[in-house]
Amino acid sequence: MPVKLAQALANTLFPALDSQLRAGRHIGIDELDNHAFLMDFQEQLEEFYARYNVELIRAPEGFFYLRPRSTTLIPRSVLSELDMMVGKILCYLYLSPERLAHEGIFSQQELYEELLSLADESKLLKFVNQRSTGSDLDKQKLQEKVRTSLNRLRRLGMIYFMGNDSTKFRITEAVFRFGADVRSGDDQREAQLRMIRDGEAMAVENSLSLHDESDDADVTMGNAADSVEDEQE
């Protein structure tokens, strides 16, 4: 085993960080120690994870994550359509002037209102009830599902709740996993809005896959197949 790889694996940070990466977490610059560790040992860890048929990726925005191949040896799971849509809205908010005005902090209510204003509400309600007529009960259930999606994305490192207040959160640069197609261009926010309204928030196989089940899904989101925590809701 190469000496520097041995040093990386022996580092006290590695066990917990390895578990987080395998669970689909994105490691951004806000996680100072973990991010610095990945920067220091990026080349060695790329070789290490290649043995499991996954790639250690450093995105243009600087965050790290694991991208599996179809033959990966690491268990995989996928995000739902609603998770994907919430992620797209988070990316849109990240690009908005309001993020600077609010010091990067948004509330769950603001997210929900933005979701309703940008996406087709009738389609959103289908996530709750395929035969939804737009009842108040269905709308309440939709709001609950949005909260569940937001919490799932938090575990993937897309947002951070503000202390013990789970109604407010800060968006991280990792949300660009949901906006790979808008990284270039004159108006990123307009491109993201177009993707949401055109239905492109729903990727192939209806999922942003952190541990996706096929190479086709790896192509969606600008070749950004992801690894998501396997959850039982």
UniProtKB/Swiss-Prot annotation:
Domain of life: Bacteria
Entry-linked InterPro entries: MukE_C (IPR042037), MukE_N (IPR042038), Scp_MukE (IPR007385)
Key words of the record: Cell cycle, Cell division, Chromosome partition, Cytoplasm, DNA condensation
Localization terms from the record: Cytoplasm, Nucleoid
GO biological process, one term: chromosome segregation
Cell membrane keyword on record: no
Function: Involved in chromosome condensation, segregation and cell cycle progression. May participate in facilitating chromosome segregation by condensation DNA from both sides of a centrally located replisome during cell division. Probably acts via its interaction with MukB and MukF.
NCBIfam families the record matches: PRK05256.1
Subunit field text: Interacts, and probably forms a ternary complex, with MukF and MukB. The complex formation is stimulated by calcium or magnesium.
Protein name (record): Chromosome partition protein MukE
Organismal lineage: Bacteria, Pseudomonadati, Pseudomonadota, Gammaproteobacteria, Enterobacterales
